[in-house]
Amino acid sequence: MSFGTLYTHNPTPRSTTLIALAKLHNLDVKIIHAEKKNKEAFEELCRYNPLGQVPTFVGADGFVLSECIPLTLYCNDERSSLRILQWMSFANSDLFPAVGGVFLPRIGQRQIIQQDDGDSLRAMLQRCKYLDEHLKRSRYLVGESITIADFFAASLLMGAFAAFRRSMQERFGALCSWYDGVLEIGWFKKVAGGVPDLGLELEIPEDIKW
């Protein structure tokens, strides 16, 4: 029985955990890549989300839900805590734009938010350091047990690790150990695994204070 349809882009880290959860729970979810260039799919998406935002989910019963955080919790059917929401919100609103601001220009793509490269680099380093310090004290983001917050945050860090794996390892050991552990979880690895190593150097100018 169909669970519903997920409109997304290919790729987009904001949908990685959603798709992995659907597979974990054996949910029959139709995946539609609704970029603007796919005119028919994009027009279909806009019938449910006039802004054309992804991810957007349309249930078999017509229930419509968008935004990656509520969608992830909905697919997981997990009783959320405020701390899980805290880390998911941080990853989505702070970490992901910061990583994108550094990663995307270095592979020839447009930044998520237009800002100075130095500001982008400082923001990414500060947020990675924040996570690294937290993970020195805690095995996972929310205590000693893995939660959906870990999978969600790890998926939004893929760009940073794909581009700057060696530099991330040198500077943020606890963060790297956590990230590698999360990506080794079987059901998640089936969807999120195979992150390429682009081997880019993360050069930090002396005037960048973080």
UniProtKB/Swiss-Prot annotation:
One Pfam family per UniProt: GST_N
EC number: 2.5.1.-
GO terms assigned for molecular function: transferase activity
Disulfide bonds: none
Cross-referenced PANTHER family: ELONGATION FACTOR 1-GAMMA
Similarity field: Belongs to the GST superfamily.
Protein name in the entry: Glutathione S-transferase mdpJ
